[in-house]
Amino acid sequence: MLISNVGINPAAYLNNHSVENSSQTASQSVSAKDILNSIGISSSKVSDLGLSPTLSAPAPGVLTQTPGTITSFLKASIQNTDMNQDLNALANNVTTKANEVVQTQLREQQAEVGKFFDISGMSSSAVALLAAANTLMLTLNQADSKLSGKLSLVSFDAAKTTASSMMREGMNALSGSISQSALQLGITGVGAKLEYKGLQNERGALKHNAAKIDKLTTESHSIKNVLNGQNSVKLGAEGVDSLKSLNMKKTGTDATKNLNDATLKSNAGTSATESLGIKNSNKQISPEHQAILSKRLESVESDIRLEQNTMDMTRIDARKMQMTGDLIMKNSVTVGGIAGASRQYAATQERSEQQISQVNNRVASTASDEARESSRKSTSLIQEMLKTMESINQSKASALAAIAGNIRA
């Protein structure tokens, strides 16, 4: 039940505070004019009663006669029976109609199950504006959060790409080093083998052919000495032909010796020592022997030349093999470097991809930080707007409480 105080202008109160329906789909408001018309009081009559909600501007100054005039008017109005009856009738009708409207609204609210009570009309327009701004900032906050999450994923993907690229770079560098070392070692081994084989061949030539050449050279010198010795044969000492006899000593009872199947005859008139006569050596070589020696000398010299040519060819081949092996060993570093350069090129490409991934990671991380900062600022602004809305609602509630207190008074 509503309590009405005749000291309050009912028309002004009901005109400023209308009752609205809580339904969002079919809202209905009742003004003071409708209530007064329903009880038979027109606008002109309300104006005559001084109950018009229109307020006039206050006087520029309060006169000393004003309080007395107001007091006199109130006393006269209280003593006026017709006015008291009209005011009582108006208060009763307003109370009745207001109770009916409230009961109707309550019944409609109870009938509408699942619908919320609409309090949008109870707030000021500033609150509605702040609510719209709050919704906008909330949308921006959600967009910043989603953007920050996606940028974080991009940064994480870039980090994973960088890590995998670093692994591939390491594998390329390792495989390049292994292939370069293996190829270089293999080529060096081939060159060393060729050089060693050349040394062995040269050693064999010096060992076999040189020995044969020395032997044949010695024989050739001997034959030449025989042929060029002016038809003389030297048996290791000069003046051998001056020896004419060889004395033999007598030993034991047997004083005879058999030399070259020649019997030594004893001479009774000589001493005990017997002598053997020696003829002069033949200093001339027969033409047959000279021809044989000359032929042999030619054969020996031919063999010497053949062995020398064979040794020279063998040594040339050996030197060629040594030079080939040495060249292969010297070029093994170059060939190994070429083989490892391909892997180094792949590793360089991986490093370039790493740099690109690192740049993407930094850009995504920076953008994600900026998005998070924007989201944080949006959240702070939303909180500030909520505080402002709460302050406005508190001010509105205080005003409504003051009005309700005035009504109860």
Curated annotation (Swiss-Prot):
Location (main, coarse): secreted
Keywords: Host membrane, Membrane, Secreted, Transmembrane, Transmembrane helix, Virulence
Localization terms from the record: Secreted; Host membrane
GO biological process: positive regulation of protein localization
Region (Disordered): 350-378
Membrane-crossing residue ranges in chain numbering: 119-140
UniProt GO cellular component terms: extracellular region; host cell membrane; membrane
Biased composition (Polar residues): 350-368
InterPro entries associated with the record: BipC/SctB
Bilayer topology: Single-pass membrane protein
Pfam families the record matches: IpaC_SipC (PF09599)
Family the UniProt entry places it in: Belongs to the SctB/SipC family.
Quaternary context: The core secretion machinery of the T3SS is composed of approximately 20 different proteins, including cytoplasmic components, a base, an export apparatus and a needle. This subunit is involved in the formation of a pore, called the translocon, in host membrane.
Function in brief: Component of the type III secretion system 1 (SPI-1 T3SS), also called injectisome, which is used to inject bacterial effector proteins into eukaryotic host cells. SipB/SctE1 and SipC/SctB1 are inserted into the host membrane where they form a pore and allow the translocation of effector proteins into the cytosol of target cells.
Annotated protein name in UniProt: SPI-1 type 3 secretion system translocon protein SctB
Source organism: Salmonella typhi
Organismal lineage: Bacteria, Pseudomonadati, Pseudomonadota, Gammaproteobacteria, Enterobacterales
This protein's encoding gene: sctB1
